[in-house]
């Protein structure tokens, strides 16, 4: 069965933890996972630098799948970015436009920041701008625009509903079972 809890009871047998809570709760849950040597998928966003550093440090002890977005479509978008180095350069302008529901707390979203970091890892020094909009009940939309000389390329990922995140999280949790310590991403799942 599946148990949903803010704390992990000491007597509960746990194979893997999936966390989509808040940065503070995620760090508490991560500490419990580390203490009990349980793999964890962290889907929470909005972490501070010191929290990200702690996640990185604890990944030396336990397997951590850090996934600000668990959808397959964003994994595809990141893969396209990774394979675009023959077409683009740091001289191009990259623009990310995102739309999320009005209740979303972090802005820009973890997904937008993840896309930005992906671009900068391929094109160090590139100019990457982000516009964030929060309105209505939109589960998430990210549009990447790449400006060339007198032309623009746009790639859009639109979540039709939130079930895609649950499906990706389940896939990630199953994949994480049996993995050794390390900091993993959704890219690792789709490349294995």
Model-found features: residue ranges?
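Short, surface-exposed loop/turn motifs that are enriched in glycine and acidic residues
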Residues: 66-74, 101-108
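Glycine/charged-rich beta-loop-alpha catalytic/anionic-binding loops adjacent to active sites
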Residues: 59-67, 148-155
């Amino acid at each position: 069965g599946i148990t949903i809890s803010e704390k992990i009871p000491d007597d509960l047998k746990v194979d893997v933890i999936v966390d989509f809570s808040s940065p503070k709760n995620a760090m508490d849950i991560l500490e419990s996972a580390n203490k009990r040597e349980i793999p964890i998928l962290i889907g929470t966003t909005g972490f501070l630098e010191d929290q990200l550093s702690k996640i990185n440090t604890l990944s030396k002890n336990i397997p951590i799948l850090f996934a600000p977005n668990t959808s397959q479509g964003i994994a595809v978008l990141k893969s396209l970015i990774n394979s675009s180095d023959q077409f683009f350069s740091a001289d191009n302008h990259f623009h990310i436009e995102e739309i999320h529901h009005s209740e979303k707390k972090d802005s820009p979203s973890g997904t937008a920041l993840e896309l930005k970091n992906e671009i900068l890892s391929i094109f160090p020094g590139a100019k990457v701008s982000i516009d964030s909009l929060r309105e209505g009940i939109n589960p998430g939309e990210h549009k990447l625009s790449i400006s060339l000389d007198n032309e623009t390329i746009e790639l859009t990922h639109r979540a039709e509903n939130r079930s895609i995140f649950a499906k990706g999280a389940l896939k990630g949790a199953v994949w994480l079972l049996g993995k050794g310590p390390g900091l993993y991403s959704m890219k690792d799942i789709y490349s294995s």
